[in-house]
C-alpha cells in the first residue's frame, strides 16, 4: 500500500460512517524508516503528523525534520521525557507523574506538547489508565497545566468484534469527559476506529509497503 491508498481507505471509512471527508487525520508512524523514506513516501503526499514510539529515534528524526509535526506514541519512562522536545502531541499519558515531568521539562523548552490519556482496553494490556480511574487522572494531569485533548486506545489485534467494542467504549467515555480528540486505529483496524469516531489514526507499515 501507500499513503494515497491509506488516505482513500480513510475517506471511504468516513463516508460509510456518515462523517464528513477530512474529519480524520492520518498520523504516519515512521519507526525504522529513514528520513529520505519519510520525505519520499509520506511527506511528498502532504504535511501529515509523524509519530515515533522510541525516544532516541524520535530525537534524531525531529532534528532531521524540524519543520514536521511530531507526535510520540510509545510508553513513557522518566529517561524518555527529555526526548520529547519539539513534539506537539503525546498520545500515551497513563500516570500523572508523566504529565508533571513533561510540564517541568517544557518550562525550559519554552513550549509544551498537548497530551492524550491512554485508556486501558482490559485485554491484558500492559499500559493505559483503567476506565474507572480516567476522571481522576484527567483532573490530575490538567492540574499540571498541560492541555489534555482526548484519549488514545489500542485494540486487540485478532478480534474484530472486541476491537469495535473498545473503540466504541473509548469514544463514549471521551464524550462523557468532554474530550474531542480520539487516537484510535492502526493499519489493520482503522476502518473500525473511524466508524466509532476516531479523529487520529496511527498507520505505519501500510505507508511504506
Swiss-Prot record:
PROSITE patterns assigned: UPF0001
UniProt cross-references to Gene3D superfamilies, sorted A to Z: Alanine racemase
Coiled-coil region list: none
Single GO molecular function: pyridoxal phosphate binding
Pfam families found in the cross-reference section: Ala_racemase_N
Keywords: Pyridoxal phosphate
Modification N6-(pyridoxal phosphate)lysine, positions: 31
Cellular component GO terms held in the UniProt record: cytoplasm
PANTHER family registered for this protein in UniProt: PROLINE SYNTHETASE CO-TRANSCRIBED BACTERIAL HOMOLOG PROTEIN, PYRIDOXAL PHOSPHATE HOMEOSTASIS PROTEIN
Function field: Pyridoxal 5'-phosphate (PLP)-binding protein, which is involved in PLP homeostasis.
Protein family: Belongs to the pyridoxal phosphate-binding protein YggS/PROSC family.
Protein name: Pyridoxal phosphate homeostasis protein
Protein species of origin: Deinococcus radiodurans (strain ATCC 13939 / DSM 20539 / JCM 16871 / CCUG 27074 / LMG 4051 / NBRC 15346 / NCIMB 9279 / VKM B-1422 / R1)
Amino acid at each position: 500500500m501507500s499513503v494515497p491508498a491509506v488516505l482513500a481507505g480513510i475517506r471511504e471509512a468516513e463516508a460509510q460512517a456518515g462523517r464528513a471527508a477530512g474529519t480524520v487525520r492520518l498520523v504516519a508512524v515512521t519507526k525504522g524508516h529513514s528520513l529520505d523514506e519519510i520525505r519520499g513516501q509520506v511527506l511528498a503526499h502532504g504535511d501529515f503528523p509523524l509519530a515515533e514510539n522510541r525516544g532516541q529515534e524520535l530525537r534524531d528524526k525531529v532534528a532531521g525534520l524540524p519543520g514536521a509535526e511530531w507526535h510520540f506514541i510509545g510508553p513513557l519512562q522518566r529517561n524518555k521525557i527529555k526526548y520529547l522536545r519539539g513534539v506537539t502531541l503525546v498520545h500515551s499519558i497513563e500516570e500523572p507523574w508523566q504529565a508533571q515531568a513533561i510540564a517541568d521539562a517544557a518550562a525550559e523548552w519554552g513550549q509544551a506538547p498537548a497530551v492524550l490519556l491512554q485508556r486501558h482496553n482490559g485485554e491484558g494490556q500492559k499500559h493505559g489508565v483503567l476506565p474507572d480511574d480516567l476522571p481522576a487522572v484527567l483532573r490530575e494531569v490538567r492540574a499540571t497545566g498541560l492541555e489534555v485533548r482526548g484519549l488514545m486506545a489500542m485494540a486487540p489485534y485478532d478480534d474484530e468484534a472486541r476491537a469495535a467494542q473498545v473503540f466504541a467504549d473509548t469514544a463514549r467515555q471521551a464524550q462523557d469527559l468532554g474530550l474531542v480528540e480520539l487516537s484510535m486505529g492502526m493499519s489493520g483496524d482503522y476502518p473500525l476506529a473511524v466508524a466509532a469516531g476516531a479523529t487520529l489514526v496511527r498507520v505505519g507499515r501500510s505507508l511504506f509497503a
